[in-house]
Each structure stands twice: as C-alpha cells, then as structure tokens.
Regions:
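Conserved ABC transporter NBD signature motif
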Residues: 58-74
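Conserved ABC ATPase "signature" region
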Residues: 96, 100, 107-125
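ABC ATPase "signature
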Residues: 213-214
Length: 246
C-alpha cells in the first residue's frame, strides 16, 4: 500500500525556487532515504509532507489524503533535525505532554510512554530534567516523542546527527525492527552514505532536484559503481548536463 506520494512538487519563496518537480513514493513497511548535502532541499520536502508548508505546484498525499489535512496529524510521527524538547521538564514530563496532544486514555498514554522509553533505552534517565541530558539522550527522547502516538508514518530529519556510532547503530536497528515487525513507513533524511545503504529505496537530491531513485543495490548496478558516493556524483553530473542542454 502506498503511504506517501509526492507528485511533481515544486516550491518557491518569492522569486527564489527551492524545489523542481520532485516525485517519489513510499510503501507500507519501507524505509526511504532522502539523500543529499545540506541545502539540497531535503528539509523543505519534509515540511511539505508534514503540512507545515504548501507546495507552489504539485501535490503531496499521505494515506490517500492530500496534505495539509488536520486528520493526518495523528498518523505522522516527526523527529526534527533540532530537538524540540522542553529543557526544564523531565523526559517523562515531555512524553506526557506530547501524548496529551492525542486522543488517548490515561491508560493508553502510560502504555505508550512505557513502550517508547524502553524502546530508546532511557529508563534510567526518564525522571531527570532534559537540560541534564547529553546530545545523544536528547535524540533518543526526540525519537520516543515521534513514536508516542504509534503513527504508521515516521519522518526523521537527520535522526543520528551528533550522536556516537554505538547509539547510531542501535537507532538503525530499531528503525529496521519498526519497519519489519510493525510495518511502519519511515522517511529518513541523511547525507551519510553508510546510513543510506540501510534504506530500502533512495531519493537522491541535488540543488532541489531529484537526480535518481532506486534501491542502493539497483543504483550501484545501474551506474556501474561500487558505492553510493559514486552514484551521487555520477547521477548529479548527468542531471547537470541534461539541465544545461535543456
């Protein structure tokens, strides 16, 4: 089942165009990576999927509903690039606050909080103020917040930036488990190519344009190279040449 469909989306701010005809889909139980350097348009795409902004052209559909749509808010879990947490509250109080935004009974809230705290391994720190957390602990709490309402679609903007390799590995193990066991659809932005290898499908973006899409292995086969950095460079070069001709 198609959970997300981005259909020929362009975005401009005044005369400054950010995105050109971006198109891709994500199926249920799939991790899709948006791959590209800083400033390529990844976060703008995320905002359009979330309904935080409108496309200048094209449409975004989540679960067969056009975005923005208030009824979709409970269906999307979002982890921003910078942690949107209340520093003076404890981890537990943060989770209770975010859980209260969704129509859950007290019992459901407690069940979900216990589940996500265990999931991100924060049991020993959950009653401490977030201001005392390390960067990695804050990222883990942000992931817990994104999962609190048990959404079918997870959108994670650079989820492992600034955390140690061991924690990064554990987060990716958890994302893979969520995909396989709970059939979550997960959209991840990253510029780290070894993380890109863990995705089912990749959407490579350069200067606001999709330069190529496909599974990591298919892309390496299609471009006859051994790693994704080479795919990006080769696809980017071909796209640039095509733009110059047209």
């Amino acid at each position: 089942m198609s959970v997300l469909h981005v259909n020929n989306v362009s975005k401009s701010y005044g005369k400054h165009q950010i995105l050109w005809n971006v198109q891709f889909s994500a199926q249920q139980g799939q991790i899709v990576g948006l791959i590209g350097p800083s400033g390529s348009g990844k976060t703008t795409i995320i905002k359009l999927i979330m309904g935080m902004d409108y496309p200048s052209a094209g449409t975004v559909e989540v679960l067969q509903k056009q975005v923005p749509n208030l009824s979709l808010l409970k269906q999307i879990g979002y982890m921003a690039q910078s942690d949107a947490l209340y520093q003076d509250l404890t981890g537990y109080e943060n989770l209770t606050f975010f859980a209260s935004m969704f129509l859950m009974t007290k019992e459901e809230q407690q069940e979900r909080i216990a589940y996500v705290v265990n999931l991100v391994q924060l049991e020993s720190a959950i009653k401490k103020r977030v201001a005392t957390y390390s960067g990695g602990m804050k990222r883990r709490l942000s992931l817990a917040v994104a999962l609190i309402q048990n959404p079918p679609l997870l959108i994670l903007d650079e989820p492992t930036v600034g955390i140690d390799p061991e924690l990064r590995k554990s987060i990716w193990q958890e994302l893979t488990r969520l995909k396989n066991e709970e059939q979550k659809t997960i959209i991840v932005t990253t510029h780290v190519m070894d993380e890109a290898e863990k995705c089912d499908d990749l959407v490579m973006i350069r200067e606001g344009r999709v330069i190529t899409t496909g599974s990591p292995q298919k892309l390496k086969d299609d471009y006859q190279v051994t790693n994704l950095e080479e795919v990006f460079l080769k696809a980017g070069g071909e796209a640039h040449a095509h733009q110059s001709i047209s």
